[in-house]
């Protein structure tokens, strides 16, 4: 953690200079991976929001920081990142342990597998996180064939593209309902 302490100290010293250059630009801190207390302190000091990933939430730990009831308003919630499976792929019964699927069902009120993506979206939009971000592949409910990136591989990464007509009026209506219902303007 010595390197993190030093890095955090350097950022504190440079924060005013950074703010002078970027002005009102919004920064989201990628605070994923190994927990380091200095990173948490840095986020508190700078006010930069951290990331919460719903795909990381259902490990069985009821105090997992990625569970929506653990979010703070100063956070940004994602379904997954560009390095994760799509929500459809991630929540397939064959990809998860039975207890994990049961926890997801109980937590989000899922009664059928085909409801999971809609429930994940609703849960994220209803959370206290200040910002909600989902990949288009998740809005469109696409399987892992549309995954953006698979770390440690080469060849088919960063190739998925949305085609004209993929985003339907039903998708738009659902997103509009989420934004309106949960006051995310």
Region locations from a protein language model:
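Structured C-terminal cap/extension of enzyme domains
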Residues: 141-185
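Acidic, Ser/Thr-rich peripheral helices and adjacent loops at domain boundaries
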Residues: 6, 46, 51, 152-161
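Alpha-helix-loop-beta-strand connector modules within alpha/beta enzyme cores
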Residues: 13-22
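Conserved alpha/beta catalytic core and glycan-binding cleft of carbohydrate-active enzymes
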Residues: 23-25, 31-144
